[in-house]
Amino acid sequence: MMLIIGLGNPGKEYEHTRHNIGFIALENIAKQYETSFSVKKKFHCEIAESTNNGQKLIFVKPTTYMNLSGKSVIAVKTYYNIPLEKIFVIHDDIDLELGKIKFKTGGGNGGHNGLKSIDGIIENNYHRIRIGVGRPQNSQDVADYVLNNFSKTEYVIAEQAIDKITDNFNLILENKLEEFKSKMV
């Protein structure tokens, strides 16, 4: 069993924001496994389930807003009894250039409030797929920056990163994590 979480904020107003690239990527991956999301209030999320070669896949989009993502993650993790090494979190990262992807296990939260929330509840030794959204230009506030929509040009670059993750996601399912990591460069 594997738990794949995309971080973002619920609601139409956040749908195409930089902070929601985790939701966007997760939806793209889930589509590949012919599943759709439904609201599960007891888990504080939208959830989709599928199987691949006998392995159950659970896709989660927390509905708690970014800063409380851990509440949803712990609810699903506990219910399904999923170990940390089978948890993958997809999220935006302002410390990476737009469209760059990094895969890592464990580590700090880099100031990301969604990761802070998760780390505060389940430890931090889970896998992360970090998608670069870049830093704000000039003196723009970081919160305003990540809560703004991508420009059309930026969205094309973000979609290319999402496609790269989706096209290689089977490597994660096959437990070829180093190979997945090398393909993200």
From Swiss-Prot:
Chief location category: cytoplasm
Cell compartments where the protein resides: Cytoplasm
Listed GO biological process terms: protein quality control for misfolded or incompletely synthesized proteins; rescue of stalled ribosome
UniProt cross-references to InterPro entries, sorted A to Z: Pept_tRNA_hydro, Pept_tRNA_hydro_CS, Pept_tRNA_hydro_sf
Sequence positions that bind tRNA: Y14, Y65, N67, N113
Enzyme class (EC, first level): hydrolase
Classification via Gene3D superfamilies: Peptidyl-tRNA hydrolase
CC per GO annotation: cytoplasm
Site positions for Discriminates between blocked and unblocked aminoacyl-tRNA: N9
Catalysed reactions, semicolon-separated: an N-acyl-L-alpha-aminoacyl-tRNA + H2O = an N-acyl-L-amino acid + a tRNA + H(+)
PROSITE patterns in the record: PEPT_TRNA_HYDROL_1, PEPT_TRNA_HYDROL_2
EC annotation from Swiss-Prot or TrEMBL: 3.1.1.29
UniProt site positions, description: Stabilizes the basic form of H active site to accept a proton: D92
Pfam families assigned to the protein according to its UniProt record, in alphabetical order: Pept_tRNA_hydro (PF01195)
Active site, per annotation: H19 (proton acceptor)
Disulfide bonds listed in the record: none
Keyword list, A-Z: Cytoplasm, Hydrolase, RNA-binding, tRNA-binding
GO molecular function (one): peptidyl-tRNA hydrolase activity
CDD domains, A to Z: PTH
Subunit-level organization: Monomer.
Function as written in the Swiss-Prot or TrEMBL entry: Hydrolyzes ribosome-free peptidyl-tRNAs (with 1 or more amino acids incorporated), which drop off the ribosome during protein synthesis, or as a result of ribosome stalling. Catalyzes the release of premature peptidyl moieties from peptidyl-tRNA molecules trapped in stalled 50S ribosomal subunits, and thus maintains levels of free tRNAs and 50S ribosomes.
Protein family membership: Belongs to the PTH family.
Name of this protein: Peptidyl-tRNA hydrolase
Annotated organism of origin: Rickettsia bellii (strain OSU 85-389)
Gene that this sequence comes from: pth
